[in-house]
Curated annotation (Swiss-Prot):
Escorts unspliced or incompletely spliced viral pre-mRNAs (late transcripts) out of the nucleus of infected cells. These pre-mRNAs carry a recognition sequence called Rev responsive element (RRE) located in the env gene, that is not present in fully spliced viral mRNAs (early transcripts). This function is essential since most viral proteins are translated from unspliced or partially spliced pre-mRNAs which cannot exit the nucleus by the pathway used by fully processed cellular mRNAs. One of its GO terms (molecular function) is RNA binding. A motif (Nuclear export signal) lies at residues 106-115. One of its GO terms (biological process) is mRNA transport. Its main location: host cell. The RNA-binding motif binds to the RRE present in incompletely spliced viral pre-mRNAs. This region also contains the NLS which mediates nuclear localization. These overlapping functions prevent Rev bound to RRE from undesirable return to the nucleus. When Rev binds the RRE, the NLS becomes masked while the NES remains accessible. This is Protein Rev. It comes from Maedi visna virus (strain KV1772). Keywords: Coiled coil, Host cytoplasm, Host nucleus, mRNA transport, RNA-binding, Transport. Residues 1-75, 144-167 are annotated as: Disordered. One of its GO terms (cellular component) is host cell cytoplasm. The keyword Transmembrane helix does not apply. Residues 1-20 have a biased composition (Basic and acidic residues). Residues 21-45 form a coiled coil.
Amino acid sequence: MASKESKPSRTTRRGMEPPLRETWNQVLQELVKRQQQEEEEQQGLVSGLQASKADQIYTGNSGDRSTGGIGGKTKKKRGWYKWLRKLRAREKNIPSQFYPDMESNMVGMENLTLETQLEDNALYNPATYIGDMAMDGREWMEWRESAQKEKRKGGLSGQRTNAYPGK
């Protein structure tokens, strides 16, 4: 305990010295000037009713689309302006190959053709199926039933019967 009390609680260095009188006077003068300027500005505001710059009636170009008043996000960054600008930028950036001139040759575009087996398939020929639209219901049910029966053989259905031995 005695050793702790002998040491000062806080050491001071040269950098921590209080400011000289001259510099302190300068600080005070700047403070007074700043306060006077603020008072003059407040009196100079429209009709003298507003207390600060942020409350001004006329804030320069706030009616313009680009700004939303003092300290706010620009309107360009808000909502649908942002979306619209992105959309326009996208349209400008679409390369010309995506707007091909239909009368000229489309360079780089290959003719897409179906394989011959697919072309011969009746599904791809709409004329063959126009009169024969409805499939026979019994045929469909038989096909469906066989698929259902196959499913019933395995899976959870066997487990369910063993889960409740009393029933």
